[in-house]
Amino acid sequence: MKKLILTAFLFASTMSTNTLADIKMGIILGFTGPIESLTPAMAASAELAFNEASDSGKLLGGQKISVERADSTCVDSAAATTAAEGLVSNGVVAIMGADCSGVTGAIATNVAVPNGVVMISPSATSPGLTDLNDNGYFFRTAPSDARGGQILADITKDRKVKNVAITYTNNDYGKGLADVYE
C-alpha cells in the first residue's frame, strides 16, 4: 500500500499543471497625504475593473490579475519613486496611478519608462505631462489643465469680466491651472 501511495504521489508531482501565472498590476495613489480621502474609491474602482476582467475568464486565455497597492503620498516624489520601484521589483507589468501630477511625473520619468512599465493616471492633469518623454508608456484619463484653464479663460472673456484675482494652491496642479488661465 505504501508503494502505491508513493507512486501516486510521484506521478502527481511530475504532471504539468498548465496553470497560468497571474498578471501583476500595481496601484499607486496617495493613500496618505492631502488627497487621502479620495484615493480609496479610486483604488477600489481600479480593483473592480481588474476583478471583472479576471472573472470573465476571457483575459488572455483565462489569466487572472493580482493587484499590489503602494502609496504615492501625492506630495513626496522621492517616496513615490521608491514605492513605484517596489512595485516594479515585485513584477508588476503596469501601474494605475499616480494621482497627483508631481509624483506622477517623477514615477513615470524615473521608474515606469526606464523599466518599460505602462502607467495610466486617472487624475494627473499637469500640462507638463503632455510633453513627457514617455516612449509610449504613459497615459492619463483626465484632460490636461491646459485645456481646462483655456476653457475657464474663454468663459471669463465671454462674460466680459474685467478684473480677476487668481489664487491657487502652490503645487503642480494649482500652478499649472493658474499659468494656463493667465
Task: Give short role names for the model-derived ranges.
Residues 4-13:
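Sec-dependent N-terminal signal peptides
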Residues 22-24, 66, 162-163:
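Residues that mark the start of a beta-strand
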Residues 26-47, 70-77, 99, 167-175:
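Extracytoplasmic "Venus flytrap"
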Residues 21-26, 118-122:
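Short coil-to-beta-strand
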Residues 15-21:
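Sec/Tat signal peptide C-region and signal peptidase I cleavage site
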Residues 89-182:
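Extracytoplasmic ligand/sensor domains, especially the bilobed periplasmic-binding protein
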Residues 69-70, 75-93, 154-158:
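Short, well-structured alpha-helical segments in soluble
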Residues 44-67:
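Signal peptide-proximal N-terminal region
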